[in-house]
Amino acid sequence: MTYKYFAWLEEQGFRDIAGVGAIHIQKFLLACSEHYAPSTIHDIRLYLKKLYAFLYAAGQTEDDYSALFSFAVNREKRVFPVLPKADIAKLLDTIDRSTVKGKRDYAMMMLGTVLGLRACDVIALKLTDLDWLRGEIRVVQSKTSNPVILPLTQDVGEALKDYILNGRPSAVDSEIFLRINAPHTKLAAAVTVGEIYRDCCIAAGLPVNKRFHNLRRALGTSLVTNGISVYDVAQIFGDKNVNSTKPYLATDVEHLKMCALSFAGIAPVGGDLQ
């Protein structure tokens, strides 16, 4: 996208960044708004914000434009279906825990199911993050940089213990989850967790996708459905604000039914309502 921005500047007669001001940046964003969806405009804003932060730090621009990119973009919020509890149970039960791979994969799926950890936090989890005496898992979330202390529940603890003692290869890396095949190094990226989740779905005969986040979403919905406020869920999940937690309200069907209005007193138009 920065390439398109520079190409647009050339079309406007600029040969370098000198002379480009706030009015030109705003004009580019307005031009983009005529062709791109709000979600794309949101990304363009972030790209330009990082670009100008770099240019300002490098002394290529005299002005700090960070405030210029502080505007909010109203993006369409998608409501993803919630993975049923029966499907989650089937997914976990299908994993063959007699193998090294099964022990590792089961422990990872349990962290997502019971504690709602993101894939990026699962692969970053270190042996030193586990406090067995206190029964705690200490995580500095990759997405928010928020430190979170989670309970090391018995089921999660048993899954981790089984993998660490009976499956995890000896390695220099301190990360808990390692590659099955040599070299036994840490998992390269969060997408690997998504691929493992996909394979588990295939084995369980469930709809196939790579959204390990489905487990976090299912837990969030379960908490809200059981009367936990979105503010408390945000604290449990380590979210910076409730905006990340509010979508769980949209999947709480039972409580949404209580908010539905009846058609009593509303005269039908164009025929009777069936």
PLM segments and residue spans:
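Conserved catalytic core of the tyrosine transesterase superfamily
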Residues: 1-274
